[in-house]
Regions:
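FMN-binding flavodoxin-like domain, especially the glycine-rich phosphate-binding loop
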Residues: 3-6, 10, 14-17, 21-31, ...
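Conserved SAM/SAH-binding loop
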Residues: 33-36
């Protein structure tokens, strides 16, 4: 199984920590969106797309990469992962939006993971931030378990074809 993880992580490195834990389980390389050549994404069996959430939005670098991706004709599997200071607001739906964009490109999105991350941006900075210490060991263990389930699903689908 050949895996790639695209991770847009800024501020405190929360999302990168999650990406690294998922990468261990998938034996994957973690790269920033601007380091990805869109034309090679089709060479992977599974691609993870992850971002910190900034003001309820996915990082602009990841959004730009997804827009630039060519259509994939053989349904490469994909997954998403996010860290955020607050819960997703259903009306804004950043996870749904990314999923739909990937599906429009031909990816089969097989899962999503999210957890809280330390957030000291905007008004949270005035109170020293929220979710200090997150993602914590429990969050990272959940990320590893998520990746284990992804691995089984991808390898299982390869064996079936």
């Amino acid at each position: 199984m050949k895996a790639l993880i695209v991770c847009a992580s800024r501020s405190h490195g929360n999302t990168r920590r999650v990406a690294d834990r998922i990468a261990e389980a998938l034996d994957a390389e973690v790269v920033a969106p601007e380091a990805v050549d869109p034309s090679v994404v089709g060479n992977y069996d599974v691609v993870g797309f992850g971002s910190g959430i900034y003001y309820m939005m996915v990082d602009a670098r990841l959004r730009k990469l997804i827009r630039r991706l060519p259509a994939v004709d053989h349904h490469i599997k994909a997954f998403t992962f996010f860290t955020s200071g607050a819960r997703e607001i259903p009306l804004l739906g950043y996870n749904r939006s990314v999923r739909q964009q990937l599906e429009q490109k031909g990816f089969e999105v097989i899962g999503s993971f999210s957890c809280r991350g330390f957030d000291a941006v905007g008004p949270f900075g005035f109170v020293g931030g929220i979710n200090r210490g997150r993602p914590n060991d429990d969050d990272l263990d959940r990320a590893a378990a998520f990746a284990g389930r992804l691995r089984k699903r991808v390898v299982g689908s390869q064996a079936a074809s």
